[in-house]
Amino acid sequence: MLPPAGRIPESRYPGQDKNEDLHGMDDDFLAVGPALRILQLNVESLSPAKRSVISSIADKEKIDITCLQETHVDGDIASRFTITGFDLVSYKLHAKHGRATYVRGNITEAAHVLSTPFCDVIQVGGYHVANVYKPPSERWDSANVLPMLPHPAVFIGDFNSYHPDWGYQTADTDGDQLQNWSSLNDLQLIRDTKQ
């Protein structure tokens, strides 16, 4: 979920060298202003093989932030979170769920801001990024679905909430709550609905 495009300030991209030409990054990407590349993936466990594949994809696609859901890591063991080229900024341990948020190793302006039961928020430069995972069996807090963040902000992840506005046939209670929250906060959903 993103704020309307007109409300994103023109500030320097936090991972960009001031002399780097963003227009020549690759053939299928054209930055028309500040750009931040975010990889989001529900990994359904964070095995060594998956960490290697994630590292390769992130390197090839020049990813700045990686947001993972369903890491299935319940022990606080650093080696189980290592992704080559990235620094772990925040994580939530859980045997069946879990989250992990990383930034590219050369980005120095990154900090953990806050965590709630369903999200971890980091700040990279002037951007706030919320890595969201709500297990299907749990419900949004009707009074406070997700934290409101200053613009520019991105809420990314696996929301496990369904609503016709997002391409689903019907809405569930969580979808109604999330859609109402996003509408009240003037947020737009950019999605690729699971097929």
Give residue spans per PLM region.
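A shared catalytic/ligand-binding motif for oxyanion handling
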Residues: 1-195
